[in-house]
């Protein structure tokens, strides 16, 4: 019963981060045979998403085995095969997320962070217009943030250092190129499903946005 309570609280928490439904969106979800194998499709479907799942049969051994955010090939092929709007890949413990567009082309964490940062800036919800990144982030991310009136603060590699900087200065958003993205309003760690939902919300509001 306690496990159910924790699960239900998490479901409610993630759904609450979506101010509207995602009706009409078709998503391929690569669960990496990991922690999100059961719960991610449930949450996405409750938001109105048509979900096609792959690698959602964990057996304790096959986690991250040729699938998930470090092996996007199967996801890319499936997105094109079924005509999905987007493909989502978590890693085994579901704190990372990478995304594939409708053409099967992958977005890395830097591109995803920029999309999220610009959306928060538009809504005046990005503290000081600052995105917290690591020294591994591409210089193009910094240039793009500057172009749109924002800036990046760099930390050492590791989401723990990103979080430390966010907590120290109250920043709203931070992450790594690998797909660890932290939304300070909702969590103090990366959450692959939360990231996927936030990106999906942006997609349905601006479907032509890169």
Regions found by a protein language model. Give the residues of each.
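Gly/Ser/Thr-enriched, mixed-charge loops and adjacent short helices
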Residues: 1-3, 7-82
């Amino acid at each position: 019963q306690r496990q159910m309570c924790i699960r239900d609280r998490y479901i409610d928490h993630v759904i609450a981060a979506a101010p509207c439904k995602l009706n009409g969106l078709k998503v391929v979800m690569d669960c990496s045979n990991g922690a999100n194998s059961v719960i991610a499709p449930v949450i996405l479907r409750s938001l109105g998403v048509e979900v096609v799942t792959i690698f959602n049969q964990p057996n304790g051994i096959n986690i991250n085995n040729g699938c998930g955010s470090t092996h996007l090939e199967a996801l890319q092929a499936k997105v094109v095969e079924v005509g999905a709007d987007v493909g989502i890949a978590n890693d085994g413990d579901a704190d990372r997320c990478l995304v594939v567009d409708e053409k099967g082309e992958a977005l890395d964490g830097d591109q995803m962070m920029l999309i999220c940062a610009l959306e928060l800036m538009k809504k005046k919800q990005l503290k000081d217009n600052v995105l917290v990144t690591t020294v591994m982030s591409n210089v193009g991310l910094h240039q793009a943030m500057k172009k749109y009136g924002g800036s990046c603060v760099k930390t050492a590699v590791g989401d723990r250092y990103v979080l430390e900087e966010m907590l120290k200065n109250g920043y709203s958003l931070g992450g790594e190129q690998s797909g660890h993205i932290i939304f300070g309003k909702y969590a103090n760690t990366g959450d692959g499903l939360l990231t996927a939902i936030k990106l999906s919300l942006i997609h349905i509001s601006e479907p032509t946005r890169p």
